[in-house]
From Swiss-Prot:
One Pfam family cited in the UniProt record for this chain: DAHP_synth_1
UniProt keyword terms in alphabetical order: Cytoplasm, Lipopolysaccharide biosynthesis, Transferase
SUPFAM superfamilies noted in UniProt: Aldolase (SSF51569)
Catalytic activity, reaction form: D-arabinose 5-phosphate + phosphoenolpyruvate + H2O = 3-deoxy-alpha-D-manno-2-octulosonate-8-phosphate + phosphate
Name of the protein this chain belongs to: 2-dehydro-3-deoxyphosphooctonate aldolase
Chief place of localization: cytoplasm
Biological process terms in GO annotation: keto-3-deoxy-D-manno-octulosonic acid biosynthetic process
Record-stated family: Belongs to the KdsA family.
NCBIfam families: KDO8P_synth, PRK05198.1
A GO term, aspect molecular function: 3-deoxy-8-phosphooctulonate synthase activity
UniProt-listed InterPro entries: Aldolase_TIM, DAHP1/KDSA, KDO8P_synthase
Length: 276
């Protein structure tokens, strides 16, 4: 998944369900991901959200909330030894989430929220900032700089090496293409990699926002295609949501891959990496 520019020793893999449905569901997915977590070429993180605060409909399932959600993620961390990623939507969540999570993620819709970025950057967690669907990839350097200057006030401009050293990553998840659709401009991977390590979110990139009568739809069959293309361009890691039963998932089921599908995809991406 990486080109020779990358200084990280392994390819990052971030995988898990969209939202915490139950502890039993988390365990069932975590077990299926063990072969990938044990792959020596991968730096693996288990992900899940304790709250999906930007669901289309008020009636949509959001998750167990901050307290119960973090307890369940801590259980997965203890039982499986996995490092954890979760996202935060409000500044007050950062310090509590950082006690459990190794990576705190800024959602795409909030990638310009200065107070949130600063609060997350004051923790010891890696910060993964998702590029907004509305953002010019070049302008993401300013979000990176907010985080970097919070961690080291002497930094004047963002570079790949400085962002890597200070644990500030970016994540590409597609750009708005008319109403209810996204497209991935692969040029953004190279552009953003000039000033930060870049993770490619293969499953949210195939989302169709708000395209299913009060909820988002998508087409997961395109996720492997985009992921392999991103690996060829050069990325630092892959983000992919996975579920043992995507059709019955409580959020983003149309975009998610089954664990065995993800395993095959990662194998392909590592082969592509060997070409560079």
């Amino acid at each position: 998944m990486k080109t020779s520019k990358t200084k990280t020793p392994k390819s990052v893999l971030i995988a898990g369900p969209c939202v915490i449905e139950s502890l039993e569901n988390l365990r069932s997915i975590a077990i299926k991901l063990q072969p990938l977590a044990n792959n020596e070429r991968l730096d693996f993180y288990f992900k899940a959200s304790f709250d999906k605060a930007n669901r289309t409909s008020l009636e949509s399932y959001r998750g167990p909330g901050l307290g119960k959600g973090l307890e369940m993620l801590q259980t997965i961390k203890d039982e499986f030894g996995y490092k954890i990623l979760t996202d935060v939507h409000e500044s007050y969540q950062a310090s509590a989430a950082a006690k459990v999570a190794d990576i705190l993620q800024i959602p795409a819709f909030l990638c310009r929220q200065t107070d949130l970025i600063v609060e997350v950057s004051q923790t010891n967690a890696i910060i993964n900032i998702k590029k907004g669907q509305f953002m010019n990839p070049k302008d993401m350097q300013y979000s990176v700089l907010k985080a970097l200057k919070t961690r080291d006030s002497s930094i004047q401009s963002p570079t790949y090496e400085t962002a890597l050293k200070n644990g500030v990553w970016l994540c590409e998840r597609g750009s708005s293409f008319g109403y209810g659709n996204l497209v991935v401009d692969m040029r953004s991977l190279k552009i953003m990699r000039e000033f930060a390590p870049v993770i490619f979110d293969a499953t949210h990139s195939v989302q169709m926002p708000g395209g299913a009568n009060g909820k988002s739809s998508g087409d997961s069959s395109f996720a492997p295609i985009l992921a392999r293309a991103a690996a060829a361009v050069g990325i630092d890691g892959l983000f992919a949501e996975t579920h043992v039963d995507p059709k019955n998932a409580l959020s983003d089921g149309a975009n998610m891959l089954k664990p065995d599908e993800l395993e095959h995809l990662v194998a392909d991406m590592l082969k592509i990496q060997n070409l560079f």
